[in-house]
């Protein structure tokens, strides 16, 4: 194995935990009178502003921005606009369904990314990732199929919950190609592509622009002002912990691991969401849904065993 994948696997896990905190912040924000579109407006504006300040302050950030062509810069901006559709359907679904269920439904996307990668990106090699993908997909099916008949969620919530991973899968493949990935290899192995320090702030700017257009198109003000006092800290959290951190970490990790493998590793996200939602909001899953969560976690272990097992064991096989 050329170098260790473990740091990049951990980076994707950090991204997953960041994204997984999003539903928790949303559940704190919605009771204050803000809805999902208000949340998205502040989330992406604050995330973009904070990250642009950081990137422009860092010499490496300024150097990364100078490397990109106008065409690639516009592509990164356009990807950010596409992300609005994913974020809108996901956070919109939380109006009607539990955060734990939304987290599980989202994880249909690794299977979609894996299929798309066969045609448009670097598909996983060997049998192990595909076996792990089958296990993870089964876990998602168990999670969604374990809905209690006595607490059937609204149809619109389920429709939005299903639409989100489809849109996100397309976003991931396009972002991977922007990072230099193709059918012949990952972005890091092939070289080229937009570095994360340039791609992520441009993408966040595009997302913020897209949210503002959506707000104006629906007859709303550009920004919901004032922010309710009880929503201020959760909004800062959703902009940083559930915004800047996961978007940047996933882009950087996927550039090394490839889109399909990164998507598979990030299936640990619903584990975090489920546990945290249970501890904070008292949400509970059925035993079948818990089994689905265990299957998802096991799938990641199967897929990345070469990266996470003890170093001595790898040396024993000449790796």
Predicted features by range, described:
Residues 38-49, 83, 91-124, 164, ...:
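Specific alpha-helical transmembrane segments that line the substrate/conduction pathway
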Residues 24-36, 64-65, 95, 144-156, ...:
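Membrane-interface helix termini and inter-helical loops of multi-pass transporters
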Residues 1-42, 81, 89, 150-190, ...:
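Glycine-/small-residue-enriched transmembrane alpha-helix faces in small-molecule transporters
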Residues 7-15, 42, 62-89, 156-164, ...:
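Loop-to-transmembrane-helix transition segments
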Residues 18-23, 55-101, 105-106, 142, ...:
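Specific transmembrane alpha-helical segments of multi-pass solute transporters/efflux pumps
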Residues 29, 39, 43, 93, ...:
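Hydrophobic/aromatic residues within transmembrane alpha-helices
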Residues 16, 42, 102-108, 174-208, ...:
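Helix-helix packing/entry segments at the starts of transmembrane helices
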